Amino acid sequence: LPHTQFMLMSATLGDVTAIAASLEEHTGAACDLVVDAPRPVPLSYDYVTTSLEGTVELAMRRGEAPLYIVHFSQDAALATAQSLANFGIASKEQREAIKEAAKGTSFSTAFGKILKRLLGCGVGVHHAGMLPRYRLLVERLAQQGLLPVICGTDTLGVGINVPIHTVVLTALTKFDGYKMRRLRAREFHQIAGRAGRSGFDTEGMVIAEAPEHEIENAKLMAKAGDDPKKLRKIKKKKAPEGFVTWNKQTFERLIETQPETLKPRLRITHSMVISVVEQGGDARTRVHDLIETSLQTPEEKAKLEVRADEIFATLIDSGVVVRTEVPPAPDAPTDAAPDIDYALTVLSLIHISEPTRLGMIS
């Protein structure tokens, strides 16, 4: 990027000093790093122990729509949308405008028929499992300000421009494909950062729902009031066994914690090596340079070098790649051994600076 003057990066990337240093090294130009730039629309945070329906109702009364209710499963998002559709979310004018804006969209599938009914009530659904035409329709209606509530997954937190005033997190945990775990700071800030519409709002709102057992306990406490006898008799519910829980302190910690530093994930693959070979020249050296100039740790670089050696050997043995012998150096003796070309090739594959490598030529 020698001619690039500005590189704008997401604030959720964490510490980017290593990236700035890499840019300086590759371009030869000084790189000034600007961090902690103020948000155009500041955020307010609230941790609530009301039911989700109650939270939505209160937010609507306070004029904090549109709301995006974040779930961590597609089924949960649809279930909430169907529940809220019975609460009269949209006004008559909004429902008529939605109906007009949705003309031309085919709702022929089973999910499409459900979505059509939900949209007619002012409730949208958004997740990666939807057909593109449905997802784009919801985004378009939201951009036009016609949907007071959208129920979806955390996909909206990644690169989709939909104006939202309030983000409601139904949980601070998610299943990552292996286990249930609490949200990481980067994930939280990506989702929370969707709140607040630049040019419309003076602030955005981020609300986190307490776990179900905590909400039930809050109801029991409210019912008992200030009566000491009733308060003593309360049997507080506990989190289910094996449940990964969270609390207000978890929420506050996520707010205060800076996003984790972005970690490089360079992989050397057969297709990558073949692509480099197709360019001609010393392919192995270019792969080495790619690894060496990456932001991986020294240990990771050593593993990538071993992996590159394995791939080159496999491609050569299978005949996919043919090794061209390196010509003798100009100052090489004329009576050099017949294997000098091979020795030079091997030497080019050995990086003496790596303490984890041992090369031997016989």
Predicted regions and their residues:
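Conserved helicase ATPase motor motifs in RecA-like P-loop NTPase domains
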Residues: 1-16
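Loop/turn-to-beta-strand initiation segments
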Residues: 3-7, 66, 146-148
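Conserved interdomain linker/interface between the two RecA-like ATPase lobes of SF2 helicase motors
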Residues: 17-83, 124
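A short, conserved structural fragment
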Residues: 316-327
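Single conserved hydrophobic/aromatic residue that forms the stacking wall/gate
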Residues: 350-362
